[in-house]
């Protein structure tokens, strides 16, 4: 391992293996997350990303490989790590019988130099339900409270599992702003999410995990950068014969159904492609409600890498 990694990496995973009932859900995974950066870990359900993060949090014991968090073993040196790491679980992991503000103040008292609780209450809009018990909170409210609890101790590293799940747009923006602030303060953020726009907006580095391994990684720009590939998105009034459009455009372009009456065309999309699509629509007396051309998105790349079948 290069010497620079020892300084820059908050998380270092090498050859991680974890099996359940003889089946490897993590199969020789390598991953690094740098300090002062947001690392997004993406993958379909069952890809192994949650198990990987749980090994980093000391919640699971690896069957093989090494995991180092802030240079320490999360299993044998958990006592030293706990004050330095914040964890936000997707299910919250919060005691349900206490009031929201009481819980956050209790967590803050566990740390030597916590954030101001009042500041977090204001930033994340916790005041409206401060005196409500956790069991009565909505999913989005629980997520905001769990995030506050994860960052109140001023961690050097924070793990965020689906941080904006169930949130309205205003709450989600507040969460994103706080994540950016943490990064700017030098905190390492490891983010798992199914929201591609969240990863595109926040991540400095993206790792795509599938079948227990990292199958692609890099910045969002690196992953979507293909000078020739563009995506045409088409939505029509009524039914759309996706197979017929694909035959008309030829094998050089990929035409994919994207819901009722819509599709995407991926490849070397240019003016001739747009002309061919509009000519085909006119020939079939089909009205386009929306036709846009743009760069490939992270979601396009993710689906190309992991497939489109349900898991």
Q: What function would you assign to each model-found segment?
A:
Residues 176-268:
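ABC transporter nucleotide-binding domain
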Residues 86, 108, 112, 225-228, ...:
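A generic structural signal for secondary-structure junctions
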């Amino acid at each position: 391992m290069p010497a620079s990694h020892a300084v820059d990496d908050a998380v270092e995973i090498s050859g991680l293996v974890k099996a359940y009932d003889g089946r490897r859900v993590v199969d020789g995974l390598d991953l690094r997350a740098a300090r002062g950066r947001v690392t997004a870990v993406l993958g379909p359900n069952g890809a192994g990303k949650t198990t990987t993060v749980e090994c980093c949090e000391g919640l699971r014991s690896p069957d093989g490989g090494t995991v180092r968090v802030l240079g320490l073993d999360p299993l044998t040196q958990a006592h030293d790590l706990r004050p330095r790491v914040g964890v936000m679980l997707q299910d919250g992991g919060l005691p349900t019988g206490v009031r929201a503000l009481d819980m956050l103040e209790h967590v803050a008292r566990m740390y030597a130099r916590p954030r101001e609780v009042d500041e977090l209450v204001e930033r994340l809009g916790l005041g409206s339900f401060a005196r409500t018990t956790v069991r009565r909170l909505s999913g989005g409210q629980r997520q905001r409270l769990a995030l506050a609890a994860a960052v109140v101790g001023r961690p050097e590293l924070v793990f965020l599992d689906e941080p904006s799940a169930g949130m309205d747009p205003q709450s989600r923006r507040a969460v994103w702003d706080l994540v950016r602030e943490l990064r700017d303060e030098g905190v390492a953020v490891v983010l798992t999410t199914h929201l591609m726009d969240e990863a595109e907006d926040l991540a400095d580095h993206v790792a795509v995990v599938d079948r227990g391994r990292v199958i692609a990684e890099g910045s969002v720009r690196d992953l979507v950068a293909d000078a020739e590939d563009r995506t045409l998105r088409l939505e029509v009034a009524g039914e759309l014969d996706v197979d017929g459009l694909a035959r008309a455009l030829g094998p050089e372009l990929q035409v994919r159904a994207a819901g009722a009456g819509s599709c995407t065309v991926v490849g070397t999309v240019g003016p001739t492609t747009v002309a061919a699509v509009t000519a085909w629509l006119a020939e079939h007396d089909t009205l386009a409600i929306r036709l846009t051309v743009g760069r490939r998105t992270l979601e396009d790349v993710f689906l190309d890498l992991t497939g489109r079948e349900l898991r």
